[in-house]
Amino acid sequence: MKQWETFAAKYLSATDFKDSSAFYGFNTALLMIRVLKQCGDDLSRDNIMRQALNLKDFVVPGSFPGASINTSPTNYFPHRQLHLARLDGEHWEPLGELLSD
């Protein structure tokens, strides 16, 4: 979260900081950076797809403890874990343990 807070303080208004879409975009950009780093000097479409389908235990800021992104050539869906939560009137409170497929 510290990485997000530093980025948001530098580049976003106070309103944008609270926008979950901005946070999602930030995490998506971090995921793309990870894929491009895995590509090395080979930035061909084939290699970008190969690396995007070879993500292992990548953790984005703000994810629940234990949640990570994993992809494979047979499973394109990066998020295969969820945490049920309940709104207590102001905040989302996690319920139970992290669920995985």
Residue ranges of predicted features:
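Extracytosolic ligand-binding ectodomains
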Residues: 1-101
